Curated annotation (Swiss-Prot):
Intrachain S-S bonds: none
Origin: domain of life: Eukaryota
Name of the protein in question: Homeobox protein Hox-D9
UniProt GO MF annotations: DNA-binding transcription factor activity; DNA-binding transcription factor activity, RNA polymerase II-specific; RNA polymerase II cis-regulatory region sequence-specific DNA binding
Role played: Sequence-specific transcription factor which is part of a developmental regulatory system that provides cells with specific positional identities on the anterior-posterior axis.
């Protein structure tokens, strides 16, 4: 067997492409007039039956055109598909080109692609290039754990598991925070209300202690004047970022503390 590379031309829209064909074992002098010269120039020949007549020994089967009358010169055999690759099936290289029946005894092509532009009756399977489209990423549900190990926090169920853990922690913290009041309520004796004051909780608001800076400024103001006018009280409250009521209460408490200290001091002097 000998491999011959020939350059063919057609009168249609597609021309000047190469065809690798496996020719039958015959003397070279039979195909000598058909070989292309070194100048690579070939006179155009009529397409269709004329081309098939030159290769009558290969049993070419002519097929009707698939397009309108203006496209009658182009046959399905002449359509070149860009996805046909020669190195996948080197012994069937003739199937990529114009002539189909070079090696009819060969095995059929495993991968086929159907073209929407052809009529179903005139369609011919073409060798498809494998792995043309990128592989689709499998979903998390269908992915096997052995195929792709992923940490638990980054897996599909990791987020749900983290949410469940946080919810459980919140519930545990709520139970622990509210556990003492429940125990206290259980310890209360409805039959003995006099003993309930031991476990009673204070309803007073928590004290809002003044900062050291605020206390120092209020002490200075108190030493300067034990009683503040309303205007001065508003001014001090504005400077110290306090309310007028807080300044008023602090001065009242400071005066009561001073009176108590004076009484204690007077009692010691009498003794």
């Amino acid at each position: 067997m000998s491999r011959k590379r020939s350059k063919m031309s057609s009168s249609g829209t597609i021309s000047n492409y190469y065809v690798d064909g496996v020719m039958a074992q015959e003397p070279e002098d039979v195909y000598a007039p058909r070989l292309i010269q070194a100048s690579h120039t070939v006179t155009p020949r009529p397409s269709g039956a004329g081309d098939n007549a030159d290769f009558s020994s290969c049993n070419f089967a002519p097929k009707p055109g698939v397009f309108s009358s203006s496209w009658s010169s182009v046959h399905p055999q002449g359509i070149y598909h860009p996805y046909v690759h020669h190195h996948h099936q080197p012994h069937l290289s003739a199937t990529d080109g114009r002539y189909v029946g070079v090696r009819p005894w060969m095995e059929p092509i495993s991968n086929h692609v159907s073209f929407a532009g052809f009529h179903p009756s005139n369609t011919r399977p073409y060798g498809a290039k494998p792995d043309v489209l990128p592989a689709k990423v499998p979903e998390c549900d269908t992915l096997e754990p052995e195929a792709r190990p992923v940490p638990a926090e980054f897996s599909c169920g990791g987020a749900l598991g983290a949410e469940k853990v946080t919810k459980e922690q919140r519930r545990a913290s709520e139970i622990s925070s509210h556990g003492e009041p429940k125990d206290e309520k259980q310890q209360l004796d409805p039959n003995n209300p006099a003993a309930n004051w031991i476990h009673a909780r204070s309803t007073r608001k928590k004290r809002c202690p003044y900062t050291k800076y605020q206390t120092l400024e209020l002490e200075k103001e108190f030493l300067y004047n034990m009683y503040l006018t309303r205007d001065r009280r508003f001014e001090v409250a504005r400077i110290l970022s306090l309310t007028e009521r807080q300044v008023k209460i602090w001065f009242q408490n400071r005066r009561m503390k001073m009176k108590k200290m004076n009484r204690e001091k007077g009692g010691k002097d009498q003794l």
